[in-house]
UniProtKB/Swiss-Prot annotation:
Lineage: Bacteria, Bacillati, Actinomycetota, Actinomycetes, Mycobacteriales
Active site: 215
Keyword match Endoplasmic reticulum: no
Binding site for 3-methyl-2-oxobutanoate: 78-79, 117, 147
Protein's recorded name: 3-methyl-2-oxobutanoate hydroxymethyltransferase
Gene Ontology cellular component annotations, sorted alphabetically: cytoplasm
Gene3D superfamilies (alphabetical): Phosphoenolpyruvate-binding domains
Pathway given in the UniProt record: Cofactor biosynthesis; (R)-pantothenate biosynthesis; (R)-pantoate from 3-methyl-2-oxobutanoate: step 1/2
Keyword Metal-binding: yes
Main location: cytoplasm
Cofactor note as given: Binds 1 Mg(2+) ion per subunit.
């Protein structure tokens, strides 16, 4: 009887059901109790043809909002280098700078799968370094999985981590940590380079990665790779055929300054609203309007 109950609940909980399509209402907590999203749920969604969204996040409060919104996968990306710490690239950020961010996100998102980025310099030297870095994120921060950049060149690291029981999300195409080698922010996998991108995708899948991010890859190539792989693909500037999509949340919500990349769609003007609220608050304080009687004891 208990097995039947468990099986039935698995079919109806948040983690086992596909994400709710845009424009439709999420099931109520009473009708569909939520549980933790696991890597096997992403595999199930790929097999069933259900697409899903991933967002970056770097703090407790934002993680809580996205978890409440039903975002199934949250990435504490090394993009924190840019949007949290103000570095020009992702290269300078360290494990010690990322771990406190991951801790906050894990606490704020009880249902999402939380993935932590391994920063530049923490895994390139080989499997032992990768295992040491990933272990810190799992033990000290409570991450559920880690992400690392590279294809064939990091296959041994991926195999080592998965053998140790650490789920790995791979990242191919444009890899921001290699921006200096790649000559800037350039689309990868065009022309003859397509074969290497395909080889990278196959290599990370065979090494044991549970999914792979493809960044700034031609849509046609991303479609081909998604069809070849049994693991989910996650696109960022890789067209609509990927199994999932990811954006930096500040780009998605309109908090980032400057021109957005071509692959970004802005769904809000959070930056404008924050500025408006801050200006109004300052004016109310200066004019003696705030605090008013209702704000006093």
């Amino acid at each position: 009887m208990s097995e039947q109950i468990s099986e039935q609940s698995e079919q109806n909980v948040y983690g086992a059901c596909p994400p709710v399509p845009a424009g439709e209402s999420s099931p109520s907590a009473a009708s569909a109790p939520r549980t933790k999203v696991r890597t096997h749920h992403l595999q199930k969604w790929k097999a069933e043809g259900h697409k899903w969204a991933m967002l970056t996040v770097y703090d407790y409060s934002t993680a809580r909002a996205f978890d409440d919104a039903g975002i199934p996968v949250l990435l504490v990306g090394d993009s924190a280098a840019n949007v949290v710490y103000g570095y020009d690239t992702t290269v300078p950020i360290s494990i010690d700078e990322l771990i406190p961010l991951v801790r906050g996100v894990v606490r704020g998102a009880p249902h999402a799968l939380v993935v932590a980025d391994l920063p530049f310099g923490s895994y390139e030297s080989g499997p032992s370094a990768a295992l040491a870095a990933a272990t810190r994120f799992m033990k000290e921060a409570g991450a559920h999985a880690v992400k690392l950049e590279g294809g064939e060149r990091v296959a041994e690291q991926i195999a080592c981590l998965t053998a140790a029981g650490i789920p790995v999300m791979a990242h191919i195409g444009f890899t921001p940590q290699s921006v200096n080698t790649l000559g800037g922010f350039r689309v990868q996998g065009r022309g003859d380079a397509a074969e290497q991108t395909i080889a990278d995708a196959i290599a990370v899948a065979e090494a044991g990665a549970f999914s792979v991010v493809m960044e700034m890859v031609p849509a046609e190539l991303a479609t081909q790779i998604t069809g070849k792989l049994t693991i989910p693909t996650i696109g960022i500037g890789a067209g609509p055929s990927c199994d999932g999509q990811v954006l930096v949340w500040q780009d998605m919500a309109g908090l980032s300054s400057g021109k957005a990349p071509r692959f970004v769609k802005r769904y809000a003007d959070v930056g404008g609203e924050l500025r408006r609220a801050a200006v109004q608050y300052a004016q109310d304080v200066a004019g003696g309007v705030f605090p008013a009687e209702e704000h006093c004891f």
